[in-house]
Amino acid sequence: MIPNAQDTRVLGSEIADLKVPAVIPNTDYENEAKPAYYNDTATPMHQRMEALVLDLQDRLVVALESLEPSRKFIRDRWEREDGNGYGISCVLQDGEVYEKAGVNVSVIEGTLAPGQLRSMRERNPQTANKLNANEEYDFRVAGVSVVVHPRNPYAPTAHKNYRRFEVYRKSNKEAGPVLAWFGGGADLTPAYLFEDDVKYFHQTLKQACDAHDPQYYPRFKQWCDTYFTNIHRDETRGVGGIFFDDLEDKAPEELFHFAYDAGSAFIKAYVPLVAKRMTMPYTLRERNWQLIRRGHYAEFNLVYDRGTKFGLMTPGARIESILMSLPLTARWEYMNQPEPGSPEAHLLEAVRTTTDWAK
């Protein structure tokens, strides 16, 4: 059970020395110069996507580190044993601001396993029309995946993922991809609801979407609400954001620019929220509730998340990177039920209803 509201034992001694920087780097992507790869149409798209995800990783790590006084991200570069790709895992654990944060890049290729091919064909009729169930296919994917679990219960957890996936006929890879799409999104998972924070997060993502298609935000917001649902609990994982997959409705160049803007907008949408909440005092009550909500977060990632399941089905996959999204600590209490009218109950109302946060 959540400790009594009268429990005022203050935790989080680390907040006493935390200072919010006057300027958080890399949060003004609209006015920053575009990198060389942005308009480099002479370079193959898969190489430009690799450059994009590495750039997004670097810029987000710098922004997150600007708030953390005691630790830096560990950069762990790894190579697949079969030589078909690499990754860079940037991880920070046991910091004063971040209990666990991971910003991972993976650039890999291989052969689609039968289960992966079947899953792709079942979820999308257009994919089923382009991929023969009896044929072998190779794939190439470059992506960046982010999960941040702050220490302070009032600072929200957040997730971001952007990737490009290409599929080739194994018998004729030189002909180019028979299928290619972009996927990704960003979403917010608070333990305590600050409506202004949620509105700011959604509005920032909406601005990035609107710059490319006014239908993107409402479409991807609804998709996010549907996808990030713990069906067994009848609640969403958090308060949403945007989510899309199998996106090929525009020219690859335009979709690449959208991925750049949406991926960059996450830094602006999220890191200032951590800065805003990381110095708030909290007690054992708030800490325990945060851990309970993290338990629900872990349930979604292990039971429903498509990326986690795809990774676990991939031969030679790096399990440490796949499970990076799990929180460092979590809590499961038998028959936990917040008191009516409490801040915890207010959060549950938000994850059990649909709200237009961007209006």
Model-identified regions with their sequence ranges:
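TerminUS-proximal long segments
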Residues: 10, 308, 314-359
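Gly/Pro-rich turn-and-neighbor structural signature
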Residues: 40-129, 247, 252-283, 287-297, ...
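Glycine-rich, often proline-containing surface loops adjacent to acidic residues and nearby aromatics
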Residues: 100-102, 138-142, 179-189, 234-254, ...
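Intrinsically disordered, low-complexity regulatory segments enriched in Ser/Thr/Pro
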Residues: 160-167, 174-191, 312-329, 333-334
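Compact, glycine/acidic-enriched structural inserts
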Residues: 169-219, 359
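Extended, acidic-biased charged interface segments
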Residues: 198-284, 288
